[in-house]
Amino acid sequence: MTGKLIWLMGPSGSGKDSLLAELRLREQTQLLVAHRYITRDASAGSENHIALSEQEFFTRAGQNLLALSWHANGLYYGVGVEIDLWLHAGFDVLVNGSRAHLPQARARYQSALLPICLQVSPEILRQRLENRGRENASEINARLVRAARYTPQDCHTLNNDGSLCQSVDTLLTLIHQKEKHHACL
């Protein structure tokens, strides 16, 4: 593989969807943002995803059309094998990944994987979760506990407390630094 798979992770409310949406607006000739296949309605949530029924999801998984897949929060998530074609063509591919399923991504993509974990201060995370209005107070507290408890090992961290523009710039800098390092090996 000549491209890098950027596995972007972070707790709910950390700003992954906003970061990806902003990144899609910028011209990137060698960076593609992959859509996830999810068993939820297309209009649910803020993520730009491809909605599948469970039957459609299992059919695709059974036909080996998903490079990676997992179950979380009562839904099935997957990333299509098209990302492998993009990587082999030399593109870097950014995926909205799962912290719990990072080992699966590491096993498949090994040295081509660039894991990045968004970090957000508890105060900012609480504010974002409250503002989006999807969870009640006890669910927000549970998400805050889960966010504080789990940060994957051996990941690059990206603080997302600041402006969206600043976070995208920092993400792109991190990706390009890793490309230069990879090219020098």
Curated annotation (Swiss-Prot):
**Keywords, A to Z?**
ATP-binding, Nucleotide-binding, Transferase
**Catalytic activity, as annotated:** alpha-D-ribose 1,5-bisphosphate + ATP = 5-phospho-alpha-D-ribose 1-diphosphate + ADP
- Cite the binding residues for ATP: G10, P11, S12, G13, S14, G15, K16, D17
Q: Which EC numbers characterise this protein's activity in its record?
A: 2.7.4.23
Cite a single Pfam family from the UniProt record: AAA_18
Q: Which SMART domains match?
A: GuKc (SM00072)
GO molecular function (one) = ribose 1,5-bisphosphate phosphokinase activity
GO biological process entries: 5-phosphoribose 1-diphosphate biosynthetic process; organic phosphonate metabolic process
Does the keyword Oxidoreductase feature in the UniProt annotation? no
> Pathway, according to UniProt?
Metabolic intermediate biosynthesis; 5-phospho-alpha-D-ribose 1-diphosphate biosynthesis; 5-phospho-alpha-D-ribose 1-diphosphate from D-ribose 5-phosphate (route II): step 3/3
Record's keyword annotation contains Repressor: no
Q: What class of enzyme is it?
A: transferase
Q: What does this protein do?
A: Catalyzes the phosphorylation of ribose 1,5-bisphosphate to 5-phospho-D-ribosyl alpha-1-diphosphate (PRPP).
- Give the record's family classification: Belongs to the ribose 1,5-bisphosphokinase family.
The name of this protein is Ribose 1,5-bisphosphate phosphokinase PhnN
- Taxonomic source organism: Shigella dysenteriae serotype 1 (strain Sd197)
Taxonomy of the source species: Bacteria, Pseudomonadati, Pseudomonadota, Gammaproteobacteria, Enterobacterales
